[in-house]
Amino acid sequence: MKAIRNGILIVPDETGHFCSREGLTLLYDEKIRAIRPEGKDAGHADLEEVYDAGGAYVAPGFLNVHIHGCDGADTMDADSDALDKMSLFQARTGVTAYLPTTMTCAFSDIAHALCTIRHAMHGDAHGARVLGCHMEGPFIAPSKKGAQDAAHILPADFSTIEPYADVIKIITVAPETLPDDAFIKACTAHGIVVSIGHTAADYETAAHAIEAGAHHITHLCNAMTGLHHRRPGVLGAALDSTANCELICDNVHLHPTMQRIIYHAKDGKHLILITDSLRACGLGDGPSELGGQKVTVRGTLATLADGTIAGSVLCLNDGLRIFRTNTGAPIPSIIEMVTRTPAKELGLYDEIGSLSEGKTADFAIFDRDFRMRRTVVGGTTYYKK
């Protein structure tokens, strides 16, 4: 048994939403065994480790549901060593579980990546745990492809992805390319979250897709129709719904004011902060690559040769800090956006996503500026400052 003391714990209140509590000790092994008032653990003479958090925040481990790569590795490398590298780097940023994200490439390459992810799902964690895949493309709109390769865009066909239904947890699709609701219904019946993204849909089409079961929005505002007072677009449909909306809070993909507008429009709920990072994340300025396309990184901006934004170089803990600066949102509410909300959406909240007795011992420990102190995955410390 191990213990964490002298921290500010982010825990569920009586409504289920998060609040901060001091004066508690957290006892754990591979699971959270107890959360008690400090001093009540004195009888545990068998404690093998006691960590003094020194007044830092102790939160559930973060979930990153949209990440292509980091530290020189990419999901489309379709290589177990690449996923291990991503897992270790993600743990440094407070992430304890994530969805390696594919992109629009030859489907044979996507299939290879999905098989590699399947293997990682059932293997031992080497840092952050691989939960499955976010499949971004190839079922998208050519006019909103962003940094995806238009040559490999395909019409949506559930039979194409059915062999990988156990691996795909979220799939991004342009709803205007669907002839009916059959694809959305088939995905949801197999436990796959359908996300609206890379889409030129109008408001009515997007709103219908949400009603049909597409309850997730891929990187809100980016690669979709925007808000106009006579044409509300996908953005309007997303804001006027309970769909969970991904946000890339690097101040490149979303202006600070837009982050604040979205936060208030959604009443602080149904938001999931992501990175959408590429392999250049963590490597600094210079040339990189995304799906065979040349990328240049300068500061926080990653672009293709034509100037198209090509994902981010954002670390998730930095995104939380930026979002707090821009919105003034309370830290417990921000933590819900990378724990409780995605865990509930993925059907995993009974296992992860909160500091609750019996759940997996996944922790992110950080200071007021979201600088990481320690990351614990399944009771094992994978990062410490």
PLM ranges: what are they?
Residues 88-99, 142-165, 208-220, 231-244, ...:
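Active-site gating loops and adjacent loop-to-helix segments of metal-dependent hydrolytic enzymes
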Residues 237-247, 263-275, 280-359, 363-366:
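His/Asp/Glu-enriched, well-ordered alpha-helical/loop segment
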Residues 1-44, 376:
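N-terminal metal-binding scaffold of metallo-dependent hydrolase/deaminase domains
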Residues 68, 84-113, 128-141, 165-176, ...:
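Divalent metal-dependent hydrolysis catalytic cores, especially in the metallo-beta-lactamase
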Residues 56-57, 65, 75-127, 151-164, ...:
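Alpha-helical scaffold segments that flank or form the walls of functional sites
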